[in-house]
Amino acid sequence: MALKLRRLSIFTAIFVLLCAAFVPQLYFACAHTRASALSEDCVAAAFNSQLAGESVKITAVMYHSVLKSKSGKYIVSPDTFENDLRIYRDRGYVSVLPSEIAAYARGEGDLPVKPLLITFDDGHYNNLYYAHALLEKYGMRALISPIGAFSEHSDSSGDDSNPNYSHLTWAQIGKMASSGVWEVGNHTYNMHAYKPRFGIARKAGESDAQYMQALRDDIGRMHEMLKVKSGVSVKTFAYPFGRYTPQSEKALKEMGYEITLTCNEGKTEVRRGSPDSAFYIKRYNRDGDRSADWLIKKLAL
């Protein structure tokens, strides 16, 4: 009997130590899923992760459209997207949101050792139609960065529910933000264009004051519309076409933005207690014509 009790005590001690080691990671990976969504996938990701130390490399992947009908540089199929999510899960990545990265850079909160930032640019309706359920299925979260003028058109035209070409309405953006799956970013109101300037690039002959005011007017307009029409306050900015300038970073910081996303490929080291390290986050564009092997190689870098 005494031997059995000693064995039971040893087993109990080991169990307690394991819980102490892994419960924080489990909470981090699963806290933002639905209460009933503590799936095997989520648990596996949590147990394959640890909390980061004083710095961590962010892996960010940029998506645009998700469509069954075709693929291309900015379009992936639902099957491809689901396979990507499986790849992330099986390699121990834990999805994080920009607000969590910014908090870590401020010296608050934690990040997993293998943080993954999944982003969707432009605000296509098919992100809600196809990607939302898949993110839920795998216990992952993502950023959606809509273009204001496109959402305004969807609202005014009523043509808001065709996955092939519709963009998200303000109400749909608000619904996604409140789901616990998505966080919302700013992708400008109407600067996602090649003319009169390429994205947010400075126009020829434009003075510093004129350029800064143009940025404040457009980005500020989108910021306010998201707040009023979608009920969200954003602190993440995704650069159209990946174009940025020293003045744009200054303007965004003055407006309270805490993280900016580029189209430069690679991973980004973010340092605890260094807010500036959350700017110029690099991202891999997920080209729908590229194989899963391409993604696996990028993750391994």
Indicate where each model-derived feature is located:
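Aromatic- and acidic-residue-enriched segments that line the glycan-binding/catalytic groove
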Residues: 153-171, 203
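A short alpha/beta connector and helix-capping loop motif
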Residues: 130-148
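Active-site flanking residues adjacent to catalytic metal/cofactor-binding acidic residues
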Residues: 120-121, 186
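Hydrophobic alpha-helical membrane-insertion segments, chiefly the h-region
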Residues: 17-27
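Acidic (Asp/Glu)-rich catalytic clusters
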Residues: 53, 133-139, 166-186, 253, ...
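C-terminal active-site subregion of NodB/CE4 polysaccharide deacetylases
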Residues: 26-119, 126, 193-301
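N-terminal Sec-pathway targeting helices
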Residues: 1-17
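Non-cysteine beta-strand/loop elements that form the S-adenosyl-L-methionine
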Residues: 144-146, 184-188, 262
